[in-house]
Amino acid sequence: MRYSHTIERFCGIGKRNGIGYNQADEEKASHLEIHAGEWIEMGYRLFSDMTADVSDELMAGMPTVEFVPMQVELGEENYTYGPEGDLTVEHFYAEQRGGKFASTSQINPMVYRECFEKALKAGEDVLYLCFSSGMSGTLQSANLCAQELREDYPERKVMVVDTLCASVGEAMLVREAARMQHEGLSIDELAAWVEENRLKICHWFTVDTFEHLKHGGRVSAAAAAVGTMLQIKPMLHVDEEGKLRVAEKPRGRKQAIRTQVAHMKAGWTPEMGKLVVVGHGDCPEDGEQLKQAVLKEFPDADVRMANIGPVIGAHTGPGMLALIYWGNNR
């Protein structure tokens, strides 16, 4: 089953340049298609994982990134989430709305080996941008696999970088990394750039219900009951350790959106990048409302939309809204 957007690369399966391009990038897209081998000639492949909630709109015109699949338990069923997996965003949220809870697990080192080894056997190095270590033990699995592969392929580089980001924030960092790779940065230069700039990705999330936060142990049952009664929409952010924290407790959806925009007004640094990402967990109308609120305050912002996938959605549930932008600090 194909993943809900059309990005094709999945551990070496699919088209090298199979993503969609917008009109403005037509000339660049033609160049990429004609010179498809240029991706290989750069000497290394860029990987991330399915926590990075990319979309065609967000990645339009960018060189393709390969995504390592992740496992999601939904109710009593286990799924593989990825472009060639058996779980779509639509099915995931439909099941959640039907009363099922979800959980995720860190990526098995053997899954990493299967993905990375294809590049190494082709004579390419590997740079993997990993889901935040503050939210998962996935980084440990990646480092374990990387060490084994370095021993098996001593002539090749296998580099793992902790993004300290999640969801559409991770996606925005990966997008910029893909662009800079295509512009000619070496694997060492790009790894250093990611480490230097990862904390400049600012994440502000709001959730519509306490139900999934309570189930995941992020809030107590008593706090969830009071918050639900008062119509509180928890405001979460990713801190400098890459951990998801409850920051504020606005009441009602409109106030939550105003709070997100207020944080952006206080911290957005447009000279670092005008790209802003709005993510939504199966609530496109609310996502559009947040997008328009951002554009009203910041008409020059390049606002793009993306779905929040099952990896983060497992812990936040339907109705999550994310606002991601470049800033000097979190």
Provide a role label for each language-model segment.
Residues 4-7, 21:
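Short terminal hydrophobic/aromatic SLiMs and anchors at protein ends
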Residues 8, 17, 30-32, 90, ...:
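Short non-domain terminal segments
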Residues 15, 21, 25-41:
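Short, Lys/Arg-enriched N-terminal segments with co-localized hydrophobic residues
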Residues 39-41, 45-72, 76, 127, ...:
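Mixed-charge interfacial surface used for oligomerization/domain docking
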Residues 78-142, 147-151:
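Class I S-adenosyl-L-methionine
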